[in-house]
Amino acid sequence: MKLTWLGHAAFRIETAKAVILIDPFLNGNPGAKGIDFKEATKGVTHIALTHGHGDHVGDTVAIAREHGAIVIANADLASWLGSQGVEKLDPGNTGGTVTHDGFTITFVNALHSSAMLTENGVSQALGNPNGLVFHFEDAPTLYHMGDTDIFSDMGLINELHQPEIGIVPIGDRFTMGGAVAALACQRYFNFKTVLPCHYASFPIIDQTADKFLAGMADHRETKVIADPAGTVHSF
């Protein structure tokens, strides 16, 4: 499996059977400078969304239309995407699992919100936010936390799924900050590898991973990858 951070909370996963984009906010993403849109979206078969905010839905509609990708999202967000012209949708909700060729995705809790501004400026709720747990046929289990704070039921997520790779928001203000994110990783999980995200994009959130790195410094059992966006990692 190849895993690439595309800036902010966006990731590309390549397996032998699928190319999955998570929260593909590319155009207008300050953290995606230097990311080639065509390369990032090349061959995409699936798009998985954690929640309905614009900096996570991003370019989903355009990518899905161009590539015929299947979009996996909570039921309310999926319905809204259908109204925007997305044809291939696989809706789910918290606790549910969807199955695709070579992988499954389970929707788990996240502490956040999920909405999109309508044309008249009113915020439209789009279901509950989620984290996403990916189980693969031939690769380690991966947990993208979505946007969230720490919560004690993370321990149940670990018990049920035992993820080896964690994608963790650290930017503060709209998610937990780096120190709390490090506590979440150490208290509730046995990750072999963690990748911080949701930082170094909008100026209103943290611009470095320093607080997270400091919090993880003594937790040597876990490899922390805080490389620049666009770096490809193999697992």
UniProtKB/Swiss-Prot annotation:
Residues in the signal sequence: none
Molecular function terms, GO-annotated: hydrolase activity
Entry-linked SMART domains: Lactamase_B
Keyword set includes Transmembrane: no
Protein name: UPF0173 metal-dependent hydrolase Oant_3663
Record's keyword annotation contains Hydrolase: yes
Keywords: Hydrolase
Domain of life, per lineage: Bacteria
Record family assignment: Belongs to the UPF0173 family.
SUPFAM superfamilies given in the database record: Metallo-hydrolase/oxidoreductase (SSF56281)
Species the sequence originates in: Brucella anthropi (strain ATCC 49188 / DSM 6882 / CCUG 24695 / JCM 21032 / LMG 3331 / NBRC 15819 / NCTC 12168 / Alc 37) (Ochrobactrum anthropi)
Coiled coil: none
